[in-house]
Amino acid sequence: MKWDKLLNDKRRRESGVTRSKNTDVRSAFENDFQRIVMSASFRRLQDKTQVFPLEKSDFVRTRLTHSMEVSTIAKSMGNMVTHTIQEENLDQDFTKDHAEKIPEILACAGLLHDMGNPPFGHFGEESIREWFRDNLATITYKNKSLAEILTPQMKEDFYYFEGNAQVLRVVSKLHYLFDQYGLNLTFATLNAVIKYPVSSLKVNKKQIKSKKLGYFYADESLFNEITTATEALDNRHPLTYLLEVADDIAYLNADLEDGVKKGIVNITQILKGFEEVEEHNKVTAACYNELKKKSERYEGQEESFIVQQWLASNVRGQLINRSLEVFYENYDAIMAGTFNDSLIDASSAEQLVQILQSLSFTYIYQDKGIVESEIAGNEIISKLLETFIPAVIYYDSETPERQTAKDKRLLTLISDNYLGCYRKNAEGESETMKLYLRLLLVTDFICGMTDSYAKDLYQRLNGLS
């Protein structure tokens, strides 16, 4: 892979806005950034769960604040990487132009990376997957089950449903501004946000690039168009490795910080989590010792302040620097598409990551309030699927008379954007493809909801409010 192509600043459609060369000095990627920030899809992230579902506290993260943090960390890492590539002469073909583009692309990708997530966080994704696994074989169309009618790839798209794959749909199809191109972002930005460049038929948890579904069957031609333009093809875009680290760092730090602020975990428990690991490497030892020092130095201060200082000044720096060491050491393999690991997992910070993850799992993710909220979120999403999937089965079919009056009324609740996207993509397609697209219509609708809207709609449809 070559940076000239990987950083492709062309768009699927040339911008229809006339820009004055004298007054508009924005780069294509700065333009991407502004399009994202000003989009409704980005604003909706302020009412989508990060860890604490339906959380009303002003302090804890939502998907919006998380995405802003990922964007900031990713851009910072981009600046560090471009500096080192030039200083250490890691790539003779690397230019100043490349160095200017990379941080801008990463800033955009950080904002975008969670834009396809359904309500109620990652548990919402799992709720969608479980519902389809449980119900595709029981819902019928013309006396045949959907599991019999759909192709293997169509079925796997729902069994492996993934918010990251939904990002492509949101920004390139569903976010209708002027036409079918959505936000019409650059090829480089779109490719950087594709974490898993594989279809649902090629999911393989042993490979970093194929751990999860990367794009839906309905978006295969879009995926091919993007990766052909960047010449990444079926390889992971090098910037995706950096985006992944930024995401990991943001959630590892934020989950623990938010947990301390809410009183779910304290410094004594964090130190104990470190002490339960018998032999610390240098990275882990440094972070452990710093937390002990800070807790003694700032004794009497709020624990959330101490942990916040520790995470910002010690943990985050270790995670970034150790991950970037792996990027530099494996630069050629990354550019060749043969590096098969997460930067952070392959680094000397892996032990630290495992401790932080264990602390979050033990004290935060298992907290009674969070578990109760996740169960409520699962019930809401499952019930919405149970309501809307049957309603779309005979919409735009060869037997529309089989739609009930209730089905027709439910369809009026689905956004005209989503219905318009369905009609455009279904035009001239086979009956099976149309049926598949109608199922996607419902997941598009649900993924576009905020937590509050999903909860309110569920309550209204079930006579609870």
Swiss-Prot record:
Tell me a GO biological process for this protein. Answer: dGTP catabolic process
Q: Could you tell me which SUPFAM superfamilies the record lists for this protein?
A: HD-domain/PDEase-like
Listed Pfam families: HD
- What CDD domains does its record include? HDc
HD domain ranges (all copies): 63-252
Entry's Gene Ontology molecular function annotations: dGTPase activity
Record's keyword annotation contains Transmembrane helix: no
- Domain of life of the organism in this record? Bacteria
Quote the SMART domains the UniProt record gives: HDc
Disulfides per UniProt: none
Disordered, as annotated region: 1-22
The family line of this record is: Belongs to the dGTPase family. Type 3 subfamily.
PANTHER family on file: DEOXYGUANOSINETRIPHOSPHATE TRIPHOSPHOHYDROLASE, DEOXYNUCLEOSIDE TRIPHOSPHATE TRIPHOSPHOHYDROLASE
Query: By what name is this protein known?
Result: Deoxyguanosinetriphosphate triphosphohydrolase-like protein
> Taxonomic classification, please?
Bacteria, Bacillati, Bacillota, Bacilli, Bacillales
